[in-house]
Amino acid sequence: MELKMNLQLFAQKKGTGSSKNGRDSISKRLGVKRHGGQQVNAGNIIVRQRGTKFHPGENVGIGKDDTLFAKADGVVTFEQVGKKKKRVCVYPEPAMAE
């Protein structure tokens, strides 16, 4: 009579499991960089955005990633156009008369 034994050994300690959490993407630093009433120089970034939450107005350009920037020196103003649309303009400061 032959006796076959099937022996299976288990681990003495449970291995440490890996978590599926613990990752996060880096922030994109979006938002308004220069607020209404602030002085800007040509080329300064006014708003970093995804899509056109704010539309470019007078003396404001738009980059390929929808970033709004000043085309001229002046003061930033945020304007409401209609019910939904917001526009950013840069108006040059009037020269002081002496």
UniProtKB/Swiss-Prot annotation:
The keyword Cell membrane does not apply. The N-terminus is cleaved by ribosomal processing cysteine protease Prp. Residues 1-10 form a propeptide. It comes from the Bacteria. Residues 11-30 are annotated as: Disordered. The keyword GTP-binding does not apply. Gene3D superfamilies: 2.40.50.100. One of its GO terms (cellular component) is cytosolic large ribosomal subunit. Keywords: Ribonucleoprotein, Ribosomal protein. GO terms for biological process: translation. InterPro entries: Ribosomal_bL27, Ribosomal_bL27_CS. It holds the Pfam family Ribosomal_L27. GO terms for molecular function: structural constituent of ribosome. HAMAP family: Ribosomal_bL27 (MF_00539). Belongs to the bacterial ribosomal protein bL27 family. This is Large ribosomal subunit protein bL27. It comes from Natranaerobius thermophilus (strain ATCC BAA-1301 / DSM 18059 / JW/NM-WN-LF). The gene is rpmA.
